[in-house]
Amino acid sequence: MELVTFRDVAIEFSPEEWKCLDPAQQNLYRDVMLENYRNLVSLGFVISNPDLVTCLEQIKEPCNLKIHETAAKPPAICSPFSQDLSPVQGIEDSFHKLILKRYEKCGHENLQLRKGCKRVNECKVQKGVNNGVYQCLSTTQSKIFQCNTCVKVFSKFSNSNKHKIRHTGEKPFKCTECGRSFYMSHLTQHTGIHAGEKPYKCEKCGKAFNRSTSLSKHKRIHTGEKPYTCEECGKAFRRSTVLNEHKKIHTGEKPYKCEECGKAFTRSTTLNEHKKIHTGEKPYKCKECGKAFRWSTSLNEHKNIHTGEKPYKCKECGKAFRQSRSLNEHKNIHTGEKPYTCEKCGKAFNQSSSLIIHRSIHSEQKLYKCEECGKAFTWSSSLNKHKRIHTGEKPYTCEECGKAFYRSSHLAKHKRIHTGEKPYTCEECGKAFNQSSTLILHKRIHSGQKPYKCEECGKAFTRSTTLNEHKKIHTGEKPYKCEECGKAFIWSASLNEHKNIHTGEKPYKCKECGKAFNQSSGLIIHRSIHSEQKLYKCEECGKAFTRSTALNEHKKIHSGEKPYKCKECGKAYNLSSTLTKHKRIHTGEKPFTCEECGKAFNWSSSLTKHKIIHTGEKSYKCEECGKAFNRPSTLTVHKRIHTGKEHS
């Protein structure tokens, strides 16, 4: 089979026709001739006379190939075409069919082509149509090399050849610096990474890149342009690669599989990040505190803790977050969306952290054990936080008041005290709270729900903490002891209020009259003086009370119930406070001391009466004769003089 020659792919122009061409068309003639020459040489074909190249480069008229070739053949303008530049018959047929097809579309029916020119007259182009022919030819010759695999076309054979390598997966060009393999164009760009060279700079923000394509993609951040749209859901993206990855969500395709655990991913980058879980690799280290992270994004978001920056802001309520995922989860509060579903029971949550906590209900496995106290946890993070109780470490400090906390979440909640922020609102009554847990407990007032029941007496409570405190009544446990006088209490709150007796502090102040008290209960009782509203009425006798607790205590009088029993003598009482006072008879405890004379009493009421001796105050007056007394009992005895009753 005959091989391709330089003349086999030629369209001819006569000297007369040549004169009709303008300079731009003549330049095109030269470029096409040179391109064809180079393509044939790159395939190993030999052109006999090297002077041909000089002729083509300096061309001012159609090149006379008689001078440059052994066979006397007329001048020609060449337009390259080849699948692989195979033997002459295939190339001639394909080339001429393509040229004719392209030219016919342009309306040049009179153009005639031949397979291998022998005379000038064999290839004729009508005068006056040369300009159109050249326009067609310039389009044709610019996309002439076609890939067999993907039908992509190229203007240069060398580009076509490079492109074909992509289908084989072969990357023949190796980086001498790191040994990685690339395609030629990619290698050039890659070497810039080692050199630190970033010649492409963004005019908007000044950020520099080592690739022009990277700069082009970056610019879309400023313009907001998202040219790549998903046909499935209409979502738009800045980059085609991101769109391709996104499409896998719809197809369910997960081509990247972890060899360690078999988990599959839609992206290779996600797989690479996942592998760090198995290797334990944490390459991204915080310069501020030394903490290491698996992912660069985690490090960047962690840095916000040190800077205090909260770049992610909710458009709905204005709340700002350090992490983008925290903002995304927060948005679910506004939308009501609960995307995190428990696989075991189907319960849904609006935050992933809530789901993680919930899962521990189903799984009793607690792998992480505290060496200090033996307490076990389902998560290592929980163990690390727990350890701070033993070490006393409180890394999260409030900038407002200096108070420190074990956990960042506790600090976040604490800050609301200073800001006054109450983001959790009750839909029932409109009352707002600064903690979600407080809102949940509040809702039980409306629902009447009391899920925490005492096994001892059957009493139910809205809070687990209240139940735990209540249990101490049955056990007699008093873990909170006063260092000043040794008195012990069931509740820490009671101890704190008791301390006010020793310090003389009276933090509970009445807004109506300004009177202050050292105990909150004293203020609550006092308030009833100003308010005559008694909402809680006894159905038995009609007596009304300002507090529900007072009504409940009162009801025991009618029922005869005496649940508070003295272990010492067996005597029972309807009030826990009465039992407490009674116990002092057995213990001999006299916690109430007169500051004037040092005398001690077992009841506060006895101390109050005693103080009248020192003050001389006589607040109990006889309505009959006006005589005054310092004790009500003395007044009662005195009244018998007027009634005529004898003193018994």
From Swiss-Prot:
The keyword Transcription regulation applies. Its main location: nucleus. It is found in: Nucleus. GO terms for molecular function: DNA-binding transcription factor activity, RNA polymerase II-specific; RNA polymerase II cis-regulatory region sequence-specific DNA binding; zinc ion binding. A zinc finger (C2H2-type) spans 145-167, 173-194, 200-222, 228-250, 256-278, 284-306, 312-334, 340-362, 368-390, 396-418, 424-446, 452-474, 480-502, 508-530, 536-558, 564-586, 592-614, 620-642. It comes from the Eukaryota. Residues 4-75 form the KRAB domain. Signal peptide: none annotated. Keywords: DNA-binding, Metal-binding, Nucleus, Repeat, Transcription, Transcription regulation, Zinc, Zinc-finger. One of its GO terms (biological process) is regulation of transcription by RNA polymerase II. The keyword Nucleus applies. Coiled coil: none annotated. One of its GO terms (cellular component) is nucleus. It holds the Pfam family KRAB. PANTHER family: ZFP14 ZINC FINGER PROTEIN-RELATED (PTHR24399:SF75), ZINC FINGER AND BTB DOMAIN-CONTAINING (PTHR24399). May be involved in transcriptional regulation. Belongs to the krueppel C2H2-type zinc-finger protein family. This is Zinc finger protein 595. It comes from Homo sapiens (Human).
